[in-house]
Each structure stands twice: as structure tokens, then as C-alpha cells.
Amino acid sequence: MLPDNLEILKEYVERGAKEYDIVLVGAGSAKGRRDHTIEVFESLGEVLFRGVRVKPGRPAMAAVINGKPVICLPGFPMSTAVTLWSLVYPLLRLLTGRAAEQTEMIKDAIGTLESRPAKLLVQHSSPAGIEEWLRVKTARVGDKLYAWALTSGASVLWALAESDAIAMLPPSALECEKETEINLWMTRKVDYDRRALFQGSDDPAIQLLVTPVRRRGADFASRTVGSMGGLAALSRGECHFAAAHLLDESTGGYNDVFIERFANGRKWNRVLVFYRTQGIIVARGNPKGIHNFADLCEKDVVFSNRQPGAGTRVLFDHLLREHGKPADEIKGYSQICTTHMEAANRVYTGLADATLGIKSAADALGLDFIPLTEEPYELVIPEEYMNHPGIVALLDSLHDAEWRAKVEEMGGYRWP
């Protein structure tokens, strides 16, 4: 670990190039005048390149100093990983006389178990002229193997830990439409016969079901797409089960009309998991003095909203109409979050004054909560998937004592 000092960096890099066959400079690239690494490289040797057209990993640079390769690794962990896989590992293979075709060396670097094709579950936009490394999750529904990109930030290691495979998109990829076939470098062995795919309404308690499901020898992968998005995906045959809490304004009931519409005559089974409390989430101490929905409409409040089609968004829009408040008069109405925790976190960090969400999200961040309503949260499962091992394990896990205890600790839930 060295201080950010030009002369000290020069001393150590020069010494390293004399004593070792290859030198790596960690976290040595930055934007602005404090990026000393390029000055060190230029003063001691020949710069080979500064920056690569790869995402993540763009800030990487390399030089030859005293006849030795010196590589600067980017500061963000995912960028560093890609640089190690695509540049450092092949270079080590070359220096040790074990060079091979570049793609094969990279596949070996990331620990590829096998290569296999898959179809994109959702459209993906790739930056022009940039080779993009995607961390993807996968599931098979029917005879189709689907893949979708996880969070792509260079600082996010969660996506790498959660992913099943790496997919490399060429610089020419640009807009990859849904169902585009991509090649996967599998980094995890997945038993697709026992993995179910969930798409639907977000709830932290549902995510906790993964553990008991896996204890029962199965698995499920999930995508948070909102209640409406989940039912739509189910109708297109793009998941094994969904979840919904959609308010029908005409009757005051939940889910019936929407499930009937999307099922279109097919038999879809409904499982009531729990009732949960929805309300207004505000900062601790309630500095804006919000006590009901009318206050939310009348006071100078910055709101954090949910995506169209989410059950919480349907509820919020209904309450706006009920109070005669136009959506365009709500500050932050267009600021979209896709999960309860994301929306609550905007309140926690001061980016918003309030959001509509579940009590457990407020409690998790120590925020204040004004309850408004209680709603049913239902799983929706087509009849043809009821014997799927992932679904069988899921339904059994709903009675898991440990999971139920955790849900009760979270707060804001009531069992049927």
C-alpha cells in the first residue's frame, strides 16, 4: 500500500520492473490531475495503451519499463476482475510458454465450466464500440434457456457472486432485442430441472424463501418486475410463477380481474402468502409532519415513486385520484424505483421526503411509517408447473418455521 505520491510511486514501480517479470499497479487509475500512474509510466518507459474499449475495465493501462510489462489495474473491483481475466492471465500464460487462442485463455481465466447458447429474456442496450462483459442469471422455461443481465456497475461485486455465467457482447452489439441468442460462459453448474423462475411483485420476505427452497434440494431465480409485469410474463410463458397485489378500483378487491385477463382461460392457481401493510415511509422523526395521504398531496414533499405496473404504483395512483391530486403536481412522481428497499433508501439518504411502501422496508432502515392499508400478497402458478420441483419446494417452504419467524421479525405482515 503506497501513498498517492508521484515520486514514491516512481521509486516502487522502477524497483519492481528490475526485480520482477511483471508488475501490477492496483487502483492506480483515476480521472483528473491526481492520476499519477500515467506520469510514472511515461517517465520510466513506453506507454502501450491508456484505456481500453471494454466495460467494465475501461481505465486499464499498460507500459513496458526496463523490458518488463507493467499493468495498471482499475480501482473498481469488477473492472479489476475483467482486466485480470482478459489481460493479465493471458499475459502470464504467454510468459510461461502456455499461450493459446485468446478466447480460450479468457474462458480458462474466469473458470468456465462449459459454453452454451441462451436467449435474452429482456432487451439489452450495449454501449457503441465497447466490448461489454455481462454477468447473467439463467433459467429454463419449457424448452427455452433464458438469460438476463444483472447489475452492471464496475463497483458491484454482488452481480458476479450471484451470476451463473459471463456473456461477452462485441463492440458491434448495440441494441440486443429480447430473444437475441447470446453465448454463455457458464461459471456455475445449474440444475435447470429444479430451478423455477419467478417474475413479479417485489417483497423482501419472498427473497428470503430462496434459503428454505435450496434446503429442499431445489432453487428459484427471481426478477422484480412488478405485479402487472409478472402476470404479463406468466402469460407469455416466461416464468414459472408470479406474485401480485393489484387493487381493482371498481370493486376494491385485489388481483381477480387482472389474473382473469392475463390467464385468458388457462388454469392459474393462487396462493395467498400473507397480508402486508402498505403506507407512507418518511424520515425518522417525520420532519415534514406527514400524517396521512392528504398531507402528502398538500405539503412541499419530494416523493419517490415506483415503476408503472407495480402494485404499489397502482395503489398510489388510485389514492391520487381519490384525493383529486394530479400526478404532475407531485414532486418526484417520475423518479422511479423498482423495489421497496430502493424507494425507502431514497428517503433514508435524503433524496426523497416520502415514498409509498411496505412497513418492513421502513423498519429495516429505521424510518417512520404511516399505515394506510392492508393488502393480500398472492403467488400465481399455472397448473402445468404445480409439479415442477422448484414449485413443490417453494410451496412447502411457505410453512417453514424458520422463514416464518424471520418474516414476523421484519414486521408489517399478517398470516392468512
Where are these regions (language model features)?
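Helix-rich terminal scaffold detector
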Residues: M1-L73, P77-V82, M105-K107, L208, ...
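Short helix-initiation/N-cap motifs at beta->coil->alpha
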Residues: A221-A232, D328-N345
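Ligand-binding cleft/hinge of the Venus flytrap
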Residues: L208-G217, A294, R306-P308, T312-Q335
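Flexible hinge/capping segments at coil-to-helix
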Residues: V282-F303
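N-terminal hydrophobic or amphipathic helices and topogenic motifs
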Residues: T138, D143, A149-E238, V257, ...
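A ligand-binding cleft/hinge motif common to bilobed small-molecule-binding domains
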Residues: A243-R261, A344-T373
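Periplasmic-binding protein-like
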Residues: G265-T277, L367-D396
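Flexible glycine/proline-rich
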Residues: E42-D193
